[in-house]
Amino acid sequence: MAELEKSVDHHVVLHELIHGDRLINGLDLSYRMLMKVAQLVAQYPGQVHPLLANHELSQMAGHPISKGGGEMTSRFEEGVDWVFGEHGPAVSMAIGEFIAAMPLALIGSNGVFCAHSLPGPSQMSRFDPEVINRRLSEDDYAPLLGSGWMMVWGRGQTAEQMEELARIWDISLFCLGHAFVENGIDMGGPRTILLNTDHDRAVVLPVSLVDPAPKVEEALFGALSLAAYGDLV
């Protein structure tokens, strides 16, 4: 869909790649998606951008996280061990290193900001906006307190808060995930789009990096249904 092979100026942004609802014998084998993305990163250097999300952070840090009534961190590890046997620990270590290399956000020169989420309103007094411009430390991943943790777990952002972050970071349009959006795309505020790509009404949003950032209304009508492209996995 992104036609990466046609131009080095074509990019694709990905997030929340693991802990799906397709289990095999009760095991989560979504490590395969990470491997597929890692292969694309190597094949198209500088064009494929996996961003850190709450499920990847939880897996890397060993924090329990639930989805669909099950504890996914353990299921993921059990899946890796089941497939790789005695090499499971080495594979898990490599997965952790890959996740640790994921940035929190991608910002286009036209002011389009892509991230899994942003801090909730109550977290702003403790949030360090410079976290997106520096190398992350272990403290940034700390539950509830780390600015990196806030970036992938925050919910319920307000318009006033988004305007403050837009001013600090010089952003025209925020593209976020994390929150469930029944129709695949919705407005999260005057300059915020919420996207879902993990259910039957999933959409993607093509954005030009050379033109001015689209307004929220333009983005709403510019989204494309993933169903039209069949099974891409």
Model-identified regions with their sequence ranges:
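Feature recognizes metal-dependent phosphohydrolase scaffolds
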Residues: 1-233
